A protein has these predicted regions:
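Conserved small/polar residues in nucleotide/adenosyl-binding loops
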Residues: 170-172
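Disulfide-bonded cysteine-rich modules in secreted/extracellular proteins
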Residues: 26-44, 87-108, 151-166
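Repeat-associated, polar segments at repeat-unit boundaries in modular proteins
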Residues: 1-34, 64-93, 129-156
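C-terminal modules of long, charged coiled-coil scaffolds in eukaryotic assembly complexes
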Residues: 116, 131-134, 145-146, 160, ...
Length: 172
């Protein structure tokens, strides 16, 4: 009887209900994640929905095979990516509708061409459906433009100060 190790057997038997509860919870979480991913995919447009339909099928297949953690991971990843891409798409489309206001902030002269080409890169990425790249390029462009405007404003203030000081020295 000592060879049977009844204490270990009792310990294992007592842990089974907790393990089953854990599996059920994992299964419930996976079902919710798959439903969320499906909803996100249904709200997605065009190519985004088509390119991710296979990933949703993989999540459902993993769930059907009893691999709830894999199914949940795949579904969560899919839902997150679809939402990020949709958000990026909306941000870029909104900005491109205001393209004229963005272009009006560009400096004049040769520097304007550099800024214009950066805006065209955003448009190219958007037209090819690379919304995350377009969003990153747009963010970089607007941050750099804000920085440029700040530096230009500081330079103008310094120039105004120097000119006023120069005029006061001339009139002494």
């Amino acid at each position: 009887m000592d060879a049977e190790e009844p204490a270990d057997a009792l310990h294992i038997a007592n842990s089974i209900p907790a393990h089953i509860d854990s599996l059920e919870a994992s299964s419930d979480e996976a079902e919710i994640a798959i439903a969320d991913a499906e909803a996100a995919l249904n709200s997605a447009e065009g190519e985004l929905a088509l390119s991710n339909a296979e990933r949703l099928a993989e999540a459902k297949e993993a769930f059907a095979k009893g691999d709830a953690p894999l199914a949940k991971g795949l579904a969560d990843s899919l839902a997150r990516e679809v939402r990020e891409t949709s958000d990026a798409m909306q941000e870029v489309q909104r900005a491109l509708r205001q393209k004229k206001q963005i272009s009006d902030r560009f400096p004049t002269g040769q520097a304007s061409q550099v800024w214009q080409s950066r805006l065209e890169e955003v448009e190219t990425a958007a037209s090819s459906g690379k919304w995350l790249n377009a969003s990153q390029s747009l963010t970089s462009l607007t941050n750099d433009l804000a920085s440029y405007e700040s530096e230009a404003s500081e330079a103008r203030e310094l120039l105004d100060f120097v000119q006023s000081e120069w005029l006061s020295l001339i009139h002494i």
